[in-house]
């Protein structure tokens, strides 16, 4: 560092020597920002213009920046991955900027070199400040591992579990409660016509439904005795035993007679006597060819025409129609040559 300062003082004087002295005095990372602030101000106060800066002065400034970036890179690696991804990227950008400053240090223009150095110093200081803040925030949070408490384990053993022990009596009462909705499995007619809201919780006792009609009919055909209270009569004896005196005697009524069961569809017996059937009307007598016609029919039909049978002669039909209309003179007869035409033959 002393060698760079002496070479800078021999090669240039005035403003350049002051800048080299300030850069040599900054041997730590904390004074890098102040160095970047002094370089542009010193360059701008020289006789109203900017003088060229030697290569040795730029090399001194770049060497300080490079050392600062390398220190930040080592500091980022020492964090062992906590904020390594953040500070490592910024340190690499600062190191790349320093290489850009080294490549541009051979130029004759001092303004470009000062601008690159200023940006490099600012980037490296921001990276160092953010890395320290990340370390402080991570150290403030205590690292507590996950612990499984006994309160969160409902399926554990009874000594460690805090779940309430189920009561068997309450569970059975809940499963068989009357207010639980379910399908109505009762069959047969209901004794109560009330709705489900007014029905008692216990329900009503339903009678047993009778045997199916097909089963009762098959039992009666087989000759088996019917059950008490059935609607079918007792089976009759066969026809071969009807000639015996025992079969001719009427059957004695049973001692215990059950009341007859009626259904809503069956008609009720009436106490009024049944009406006699109305006899059918007698058909009119059939006339024979020798039977004379009644006088009324003979007065209505004129002479020579029969209402039941048409004659094949056309003049006869015309006379009959004229007589019915009341015409006094009969129609003129056809000539003999016109007799037996196709129309007359079709009427036959």
Swiss-Prot record:
Residues 274-287 have a biased composition (Pro residues). Residues 161-178, 227-273, 288-310 have a biased composition (Low complexity). Residues 132-348 are annotated as: Disordered. PROSITE patterns: PROKAR_LIPOPROTEIN. It comes from the Bacteria. Residues 192-207 have a biased composition (Polar residues). Keywords: Transposable element. This is Uncharacterized 35.5 kDa protein in transposon Tn4556. It comes from Streptomyces fradiae (Streptomyces roseoflavus).
């Amino acid at each position: 560092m002393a060698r760079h300062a002496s070479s800078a003082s021999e090669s240039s004087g005035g403003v350049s020597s002051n800048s080299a002295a300030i850069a040599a005095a900054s041997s730590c990372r904390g004074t890098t920002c102040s160095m970047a602030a002094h370089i542009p101000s010193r360059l701008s106060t020289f006789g109203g213009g900017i003088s060229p800066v030697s290569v040795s002065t730029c090399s001194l400034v770049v060497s300080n920046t490079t050392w600062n970036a390398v220190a930040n890179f080592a500091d980022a690696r020492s964090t062992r991955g906590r904020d390594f991804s953040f500070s490592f990227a910024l340190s690499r950008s600062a190191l790349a900027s320093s290489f850009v400053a080294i490549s541009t240090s051979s130029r004759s223009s001092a303004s470009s070199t000062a601008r690159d150095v200023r940006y490099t110093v600012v980037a490296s200081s921001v990276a160092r400040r953010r890395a320290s803040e990340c370390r402080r925030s991570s150290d403030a949070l205590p690292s507590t591992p996950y612990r499984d408490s006994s309160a969160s384990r409902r399926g554990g053993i009874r000594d460690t579990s805090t779940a309430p022990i189920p009561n068997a009596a309450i569970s059975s009462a809940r499963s068989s409660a009357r207010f639980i909705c379910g399908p109505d499995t009762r069959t047969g007619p209901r004794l109560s016509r009330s709705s489900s809201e007014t029905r008692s919780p216990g329900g009503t006792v339903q009678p047993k439904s009778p045997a199916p009609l097909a089963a009762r009919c098959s039992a009666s055909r087989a000759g088996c005795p019917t059950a008490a209270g059935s609607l079918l009569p007792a089976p009759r004896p066969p026809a071969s035993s009807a000639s015996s005196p025992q079969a001719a005697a009427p059957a004695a009524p049973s001692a215990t007679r059950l009341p007859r069961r009626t259904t809503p569809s069956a008609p009720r017996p009436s106490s009024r006597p049944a009406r006699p059937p109305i006899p059918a009307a007698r058909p009119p007598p059939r006339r024979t060819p020798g039977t004379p016609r009644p006088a009324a029919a003979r007065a209505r039909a004129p002479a020579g025409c029969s209402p039941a049978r048409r004659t094949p002669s056309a003049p006869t039909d015309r006379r009959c129609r004229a007589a019915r209309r009341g015409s006094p003179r009969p129609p003129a007869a056809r000539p003999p040559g016109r007799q037996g035409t196709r129309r007359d033959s079709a009427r036959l």
